């Protein structure tokens, strides 16, 4: 969950988000080292009077600044590709949920159950209870079992939307006429908030997403009551 004046990413709740946080720190360290080197060279150029106006050729320097960037790019690309394949791979999901984007709400269908589907609208500000979050609460939360692989099928009924939950490392476009999929797994129970992350019209800001991750026994009880 985000909080005011937060500078970093949200706390990771899924294995994918943990990997993304590690990759973020890895890449940021490389950027920091490169920036420090460039600033150091600039400071030397500004503070020294030594120049090399007669230098016409420097094979060693050219070799270094060709090979070194290539190595740096490889060090960034390899972990990035690993995470991309992890995000794309879905093996034997325990549950499948289909979500459709609408202007301006989400609808959900649990495809493993016959009649388990509902719409999820934002709760207006004037109807919020004490402690509830403005522009983030919904009338029907998406209840899912924790520590289990869940496949999300995502599409749209009208315009482009994007289904995103930052603490789980999820952001998948909802495209009319196309069915995209992603996978999620929460390692601990709780409420996880997200929003539509694709500008989709005048009420784009009023399409929150709330996932309620619960133990499997609670989920089975909830699903039996909903069907």
From Swiss-Prot:
Q: How is the cofactor bound?
A: Binds a dinuclear copper A center per subunit.
Which residues are exposed on the Mitochondrial intermembrane face of the membrane? 1-14, 88-227
According to the record's subunit comment, the protein's assembly and interactions are:
Component of the cytochrome c oxidase (complex IV, CIV), a multisubunit enzyme composed of 14 subunits. The complex is composed of a catalytic core of 3 subunits MT-CO1, MT-CO2 and MT-CO3, encoded in the mitochondrial DNA, and 11 supernumerary subunits COX4I, COX5A, COX5B, COX6A, COX6B, COX6C, COX7A, COX7B, COX7C, COX8 and NDUFA4, which are encoded in the nuclear genome.
| Record protein name field | Cytochrome c oxidase subunit 2
Cellular component GO terms held in the UniProt record: mitochondrial inner membrane; respiratory chain complex IV
Summary of the function given for this chain in its UniProt record: Component of the cytochrome c oxidase, the last enzyme in the mitochondrial electron transport chain which drives oxidative phosphorylation. The respiratory chain contains 3 multisubunit complexes succinate dehydrogenase (complex II, CII), ubiquinol-cytochrome c oxidoreductase (cytochrome b-c1 complex, complex III, CIII) and cytochrome c oxidase (complex IV, CIV), that cooperate to transfer electrons derived from NADH and succinate to molecular oxygen, creating an electrochemical gradient over the inner membrane that drives transmembrane transport and the ATP synthase.
Which residue stretches are annotated as topological domain Mitochondrial matrix?
A: 46-59
Which co-factors does it depend on? Cu cation
Q: Which residues bind Mg(2+)?
A: 198
Q: What membrane topology does the annotation report for this chain?
A: Multi-pass membrane protein
Q: Which residues bind Cu cation A1?
A: 161, 196, 200, 207
Lineage top rank: taxon? Eukaryota
Which family does the record assign?
A: Belongs to the cytochrome c oxidase subunit 2 family.
Reactions catalysed, as given in the entry: 4 Fe(II)-[cytochrome c] + O2 + 8 H(+)(in) = 4 Fe(III)-[cytochrome c] + 2 H2O + 4 H(+)(out)
An example molecular function term from Gene Ontology annotations: copper ion binding
